[in-house]
């Protein structure tokens, strides 16, 4: 008789994805971040669900409801800080996951890669909407500034912004709809994760060498289940250390001041995980140009598979491309730093140079270096 896990219609799906799935024998810890992102999403949905039970999406009571959660709800402080810092953990894992894909050439699985980029956009949209909900100063002014960027769209811009706001400024209608979308999007993300995995399992995983591993596969369980569980423990330990020892380390003290439309904070900046894109936005002195650069800074990942000129898939055996990759990482860290600084000399010019370098590396230097490596290897 066939084992139930191989014959039952539902259990069979789980079996093919988590138990009997053939996986390359040499995938490193960089392949752990996919499962870690799944854990992050689960943590965010669970903590968010319990927070939503006590939160009120009304401008008059939103700030006080968050205070009430922290002070009066059993372990409400823990839920709130797990959710806030869980978002930071989510983005750390996301950026490492995308970085792994770039380094090892996983983007050659174009369907998986493109669904992943749509997921990245969806997570960014969700995080932005979530940041507005506590209705502090940074929430209100962040929502005002970022939604206002859409007014740069020619002809329909102003109407579009007022349509999103539900009025002539960020107000009660805006907060209510942002809460609705912030609640809805994670479930759409969860569905898209399934599509992401569906496309991945069509091709199988890549591996550090970039060479097909059809002849050297091992079952996912127990080898990679135990490896993933170790990753879960390490990540959750890091998250709990952050939440229990310094919960406000990555936040902004201005958000403990209730939203006041009559008082603009001296420096309006997003959470740390958006600073690199914010720096690119600010580096162009034209509003529409800045918005286009902001969108393209993420959208550019979509054309990375087209720009792949190397005869090798992975960067493992390509030292010149490796140097460029780490230059790109350093450049993104520089942009993150610049995004948090005021708009004054020398930060303006550093931001502009870092932005030019970012697009140059991806569009020009990487493809040319790959061609040069092909030539050096006489390919």
Swiss-Prot record:
Cofactors, names only: heme b
Positions bound to a ubiquinone: 201
GO CC terms in record: mitochondrial inner membrane; respiratory chain complex III
PROSITE patterns (UniProt xref): CYTB_CTER, CYTB_NTER
Keywords tagged on the record: Electron transport, Heme, Iron, Membrane, Metal-binding, Mitochondrion, Mitochondrion inner membrane, Respiratory chain, Transmembrane, Transmembrane helix, Transport, Ubiquinone
Matching Gene3D superfamilies: Cytochrome Bc1 Complex, Chain C (1.20.810.10)
Other noteworthy facts: Heme 1 (or BL or b562) is low-potential and absorbs at about 562 nm, and heme 2 (or BH or b566) is high-potential and absorbs at about 566 nm.
Task of the protein: Component of the ubiquinol-cytochrome c reductase complex (complex III or cytochrome b-c1 complex) that is part of the mitochondrial respiratory chain. The b-c1 complex mediates electron transfer from ubiquinol to cytochrome c. Contributes to the generation of a proton gradient across the mitochondrial membrane that is then used for ATP synthesis.
CDD domains named in the record: cytochrome_b_C (cd00290), Cytochrome_b_N (cd00284)
Protein's gene: MT-CYB
Effect in UniProt of substituting residue 129 to M: In strain: Isolate Durban5
UniProt protein name: Cytochrome b
Membrane-topology annotation of the record: Multi-pass membrane protein
Superkingdom classification of source: Eukaryota
TM segment ranges: 33-53, 77-98, 113-133, 178-198, 226-246, 288-308, 320-340, 347-367
Effect seen on changing residue 2 to I: In strain: Isolate Durban5
């Amino acid at each position: 008789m066939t084992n139930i896990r191989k014959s039952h219609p539902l259990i069979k799906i789980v079996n093919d994805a988590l138990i009997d799935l053939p996986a390359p024998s040499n995938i490193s810890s960089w392949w752990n971040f996919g499962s870690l992102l799944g854990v992050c999403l689960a943590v965010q949905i669970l903590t968010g669900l319990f927070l939503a039970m006590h939160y009120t999406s009304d401008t008059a009571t939103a700030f006080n409801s968050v205070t009430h959660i922290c002070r009066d709800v059993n372990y409400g402080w823990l839920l709130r800080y797990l959710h806030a810092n869980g978002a930071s953990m989510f983005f750390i894992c996301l950026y490492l996951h995308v970085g792994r894909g770039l380094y090892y050439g996983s983007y050659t699985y174009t369907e998986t890669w493109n669904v992943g980029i749509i997921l990245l956009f969806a997570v960014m949209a969700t995080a932005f909407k979530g940041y507005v909900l506590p209705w502090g100063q940074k929430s209100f002014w962040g929502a005002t500034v970022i939604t206002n960027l859409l007014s740069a769209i020619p002809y329909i811009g102003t109407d579009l912004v007022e349509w999103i706001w539900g009025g002539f400024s960020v107000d009660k209608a805006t907060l209510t709809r942002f809460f609705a979308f912030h609640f809805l999007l994670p479930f759409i993300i969860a569905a898209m994760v399934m599509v992401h995995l569906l496309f991945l399992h069509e091709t199988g995983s890549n591996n550090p060498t970039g060479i097909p591993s059809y002849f050297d596969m091992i079952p996912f369980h127990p080898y990679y289940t135990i490896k993933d569980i170790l990753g879960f423990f390490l990540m959750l330990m890091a998250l709990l250390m952050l939440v229990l020892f310094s919960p406000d380390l990555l936040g902004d003290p201005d958000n403990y001041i209730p939203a006041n439309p009559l008082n603009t904070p001296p420096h309006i900046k997003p959470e740390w995980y958006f600073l690199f894109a914010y720096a690119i936005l600010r580096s162009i002195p034209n509003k529409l140009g800045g918005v286009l650069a902001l969108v393209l800074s993420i959208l550019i990942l979509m054309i990375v598979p087209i720009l792949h000129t190397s005869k090798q898939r992975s960067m493992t055996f390509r030292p010149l491309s490796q140097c460029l990759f780490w230059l790109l990482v350093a450049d993104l860290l520089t942009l993150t730093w610049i995004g948090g600084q005021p708009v004054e000399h020398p930060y303006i010019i550093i931001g502009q140079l870092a932005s030019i370098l970012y697009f140059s590396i991806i569009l020009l230097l990487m493809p040319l270096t790959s061609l040069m490596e092909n030539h050096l290897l006489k390919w």
